[in-house]
Structures are given as C-alpha cells and as structure tokens.
Amino acid sequence: MGLGRRAMVYLGLAEEDEDYLDDDYDDGRAVGRDDRRAMHEPVPMDRTVRRIDAREEPVAMPRRPPVEPLRPAGPVPMRRVAAVEESHPYRITTLQPRSYNEARQIGEEFRDGTPVIMNLTDMDDADAKRLVDFAAGLIFGLRGDLEKVTNKVFLLSPHNVEVTETDKRRIREGGFYNQS
C-alpha cells in the first residue's frame, strides 16, 4: 500500500484493503476474516461499583506549611542613576554635520554622557535621514532620548541626564550655542 493510500486510510477517507493486511508477514497458516476480528476484540473489564456511605469521613490530606515568599511583594524603590538637577551644571554640545561621515563625533559625544544638539539644516535630505536613523539606533542602544526641536534640529539626551525645560526652550529659540 502506498504512502498516499495509507494516509487516506489513517484519516478515514478510504477503506483499508484487506488484501494488503498480512502480505508481508505470512507465517504459513491461513487466517480468515473471523479470526482477525477475534484478535482485535476488546476484552471486557471487571468493574465493581461501591457505594460510599455519607457517614464515612473523607480521607484527610496531609497539610503543608504555608509558602512564604523569598522577597517581599510589591515595587522595590530604586533611585535614579546620576540624575542631573537644575542646580548641577551640564554642557550641551551643538554639532552641525555636513556629511554622514561626521556621525562618529555625534556618537562619541553622546556615549560620553553629553547631550547633543544635532543641527542637520546644511545636509541634503538623504544624508540627514541616514543620520537621524543612526541617532535613533544610538538612542535605543544607550537608552537615551531623542527629541525633535525644530525642522532638522534634534536633541539627543543620555539616559542619566535630564535637560531642563528652560534649556529646551532656549534651543527652540535658537540662542543655544556650544557651551564647551
């Protein structure tokens, strides 16, 4: 019997051919149709039914001590990592790249923990898009933040530095220059 035929029989789409049942395993004795059924008839099981009296006590399961958690449930307070407050001065680097080749400088400044203003106004649109994609990957990899300040001007903030609203407003107004 072929593979397709066996699959159809298995799925119940075709009847099993009785000619093929024992062809491969001929042991010399003739087996009739009734003998095959007798070989596969289910054996009746002896089942006894016992009624349970309502007066009988259920079997008690052994009690286990209550489970105690290893650590307390609920949120664990964590402090922010080196968050910069308004009283602490920080410097923001402004970079105005002219080609995609200057992406390395942006990455190094950002990696060192310095917020970077990326001014892409002097770049063509294709290179500017590549640089924004680079910055997005940089932000994702180092868990920073990317904000669009104006058209083609972006602020990249490291995860441990929070740029104040005052500084963001000054950047939008265009009066924020390199503070090195």
From Swiss-Prot:
Top-level taxon of origin: Bacteria
Spans annotated as Disordered: 21-40
GO-annotated cellular components: cytoplasm
Subcellular location(s) per record: Cytoplasm
BP GO annotations: division septum assembly; FtsZ-dependent cytokinesis
Subunit structure as annotated in this protein's UniProt entry: Homodimer. Interacts with FtsZ.
Family: Belongs to the SepF family.
Protein name per UniProt: Cell division protein SepF
